[in-house]
Regions:
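N-terminal subdomain of nucleotide-sugar transferases
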Residues: 1-35, 131-195, 556-563, 567-572
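Conserved acidic donor-binding segment of nucleotide-sugar-dependent glycosyltransferases
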Residues: 456, 480-481, 485-492, 501-507
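Nucleotide-activated donor-binding/catalytic signature segment of Leloir-type glycosyltransferases, i.e.
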Residues: 381, 393, 400-430
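Nucleotide-sugar donor phosphate/pyrophosphate-binding loop at the beta->alpha transition
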Residues: 97-112, 169, 222-226, 258-263, ...
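Conserved donor-binding/catalytic core segment of Leloir-type glycosyltransferases
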Residues: 153-156, 349-375
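Short hydrophobic beta-strand element within catalytic cores of glycosyltransferases
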Residues: 189, 436-438, 458-461, 465-468
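Carbohydrate-associated surface elements
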Residues: 306, 327
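A short, well-ordered alpha-helix in the C-terminal region of glycosyltransferases
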Residues: 494, 501, 508-523
């Protein structure tokens, strides 16, 4: 096959099968070659240029879920100047597409130069502004909670990132539902439509006038501050709450401008993530934004003790940190919620034992370990006393590798890949399973595992048997042989043995599942999670001398004795 008969496909978002279908429709005579997004991102810009220069064929197809939400469209169109294909095509799941050729790109040069100049101005202004803000922080008095028209304003100063199923979306919607059940009034301010148990205010933005997405994110913070400040001036909240992320500083500035305490939800250091997992550009700006957010926060909410230790190592006092693990809505995740029908739809037989994994197909979720365990178990099926079937729910950077490795078993009906599904549908797949697995692996460099997987608590609430890695917080939440079978992290042999043991012992599955749900209901609901955050604001207002003691004592299960809802009614 000649080089001219190839089309290279890079899937940024959306489903790979949709991208391949588009490629075959537009280029029916061409061979579609998938490019690895993970390898491109990990290699840096020099490696990316080298890979692009090696592409020779009909087209480079860059595929996403929605063209309107595509970051850095000008940069992607400019790839036509680097590779040796005839054209670059940007396409999305709806079938919309834009074609860029070398001649056509000349018309984009003026716009590209303006975008580059705009980005330069944004980077310089933000750098100077945030450096001055750090100086002013030393002079400003830290704001204290005061009586407000409502309890909490949840800030998501990012133009995207919450629309796709995953832990971030689950945490945001779960926390907001917990606030509502606790009787608190909240409002969400974000850059995209989102279904939540509160009023949602959309702050529009634009990426089309920027060359780099980092500049677009930084400038969006400024737009976000102006819009939210105007809205909150009309109806003031008692607390600001922001989920920490890359290039975010809006919550910090709004807190000091309006004199409202900021609660920062801190799930990881973005600087550390950029070094070890998810490469980033413009690192000095990323670090500066993180420093500003941490310095300005009155309370930092972390999901695990290792994260608390990391913050204390960089100078954050223990009194400013609340350990508050992720949680679950047990009214949504519960046994007998559609699994039986799904089993029929999937052709699962009564004698088969279903093992389910839900999550991102990435390294730290342990999918490579799971793959080895599955191969080991299915290769010895003929010697086993029970029939196993695996249900793998989700998507991610290692999905193509996992699909290829398990393809013989998938074709035999022993492994089912569902791809990404809406979070509201996850419970049916969990309910269809007999065993749920969470094979997380250790962090690089022997760093403590700092995560708090939301799926872990969803597993528990479903009342199913769990096989999980004995890893930091996972081992703190689960108890071996009482609520789960815990195995050595990164050991496919131990994972396989645990699955085999559960598969052959139905009574053990029932006991572990029943105990796990009891623990989830007692300590790990979103309502309890939200209550611990609200207690900070209520107790600071009612007794400032008691606040330090309360915050340092709060941890998993130690919920304040006074009901925040009754105190809040008095404040109103």
């Amino acid at each position: 096959m000649s080089p001219q008969s190839k089309v290279f496909v890079l899937v940024l978002a959306g489903l790979e099968r949709d991208a391949l279908a588009f490629a075959h429709r537009r280029y029916p005579a061409c061979e579609a070659v998938i490019l690895s997004k993970t390898e491109l991102r990990a290699g840096g810009w020099k490696s990316q240029l080298r890979i692009l220069r090696q592409l020779k064929g009909e087209a480079l197809l860059i595929f996403t879920d929605f063209l309107e939400s595509l970051q850095e469209p000008i940069l992607f169109k400019s790839t036509v100047l680097v590779h040796r294909c005839r054209e670059t095509v940007l396409a999305d799941s709806s079938g919309s597409f834009e074609v860029s050729t070398r001649v056509g790109f000349l018309g984009l040069l003026p716009r590209s130069l303006i975008a580059a100049l705009t980005d330069a101005i944004v980077f310089v202004c933000v750098w100077i502004g945030l450096q001055l803000f750090l100086v002013w922080l030393k002079l400003w008095r830290e704001p204290k909670p005061q009586v407000g028209e409502f309890d909490l304003a949840f800030l998501c100063p990012s133009q995207g990132g919450l629309g796709a199923p995953g832990g971030a979306l689950t945490h945001v919607t779960g926390f907001l539902s917990g606030l509502a059940k606790e009787g608190a009034r909240s409002a969400l301010f974000c850059g995209q439509p989102l279904q939540a148990a509160c009023d949602v205010h959309i702050v529009s933005g634009s990426r089309r006038f920027h060359l780099f997405r980092e500049a677009a994110n930084l400038s969006y913070n400024i737009r976000f501050i102006a819009a939210v400040h105007k809205l909150l001036a009309q109806e003031r909240p008692r607390l600001l709450y922001q989920r920490h992320g890359r290039f975010l500083f809006a919550g910090a500035l709004l807190s000091r401008l309006m004199g409202i305490p900021l609660v920062l939800e801190y799930n990881a250091s973005e600087d550390w993530m950029a070094k070890h997992w998810d490469p980033a550009r413009f690192i000095p700006w990323l670090r500066l934004c993180e420093r500003v957010s941490v310095k300005a926060a009155s309370l930092i909410v972390v999901v695990s003790n290792p994260l608390k230790q990391q913050l204390m190592e960089v100078g954050v006092s223990a009194e400013r940190i609340l350990v508050n693990p992720n949680a679950v809505d047990p009214e949504w995740f519960h046994p007998d919620c559609g699994g039986a029908k799904l089993q029929q739809d999937l052709g699962i037989q009564a004698e088969e034992v279903v093992v389910c994994f839900v999550g991102t197909f990435s390294y730290w979720h342990g999918v490579a370990v799971l793959e080895q365990a599955i191969r080991s178990l299915l290769d010895r099926t003929q010697r086993a006393s029970c029939l196993l079937k695996f249900l793998l729910v989700g998507d991610g950077p290692l999905a193509p590798q996992l699909r290829n490795a398990l393809d013989p078993y998938a074709r035999g009906g022993l492994v089912t890949f569902t791809g990404a599904i809406p979070h509201k549908s996850v419970r049916m797949y969990l309910d269809a399973a007999d065993i749920l697995v969470s094979p997380h692996v250790p962090m690089p460099g022997e760093r403590p595992f700092f995560g708090s997987p939301t799926k872990l608590f969803e597993y528990m609430a479903m009342g199913k048997a769990i096989a999980a890695s004995a890893l930091d917080q996972i081992a703190d939440v689960l108890e071996h042989a009482r609520t789960a079978l815990l195995v050595k992290p990164g050991d496919p042999g131990e994972l396989a043995e645990a699955i085999q043991r559960l598969a052959c012992d139905a009574q053990l599955r029932v006991e572990l599942g029943r105990n796990a749900r009891k623990v989830a209901l007692a300590s790990h609901t979103w309502q309890q999670n939200a209550k611990r955050v609200l207690a900070y604001g209520v107790d600071t207002m009612s007794a400032s001398d008691e606040s330090s003691l309360l915050r340092s004592a709060v941890s998993v299960g130690s919920v304040p004795s006074r009901r925040t809802s009754s105190v809040r009614q008095n404040l109103r």
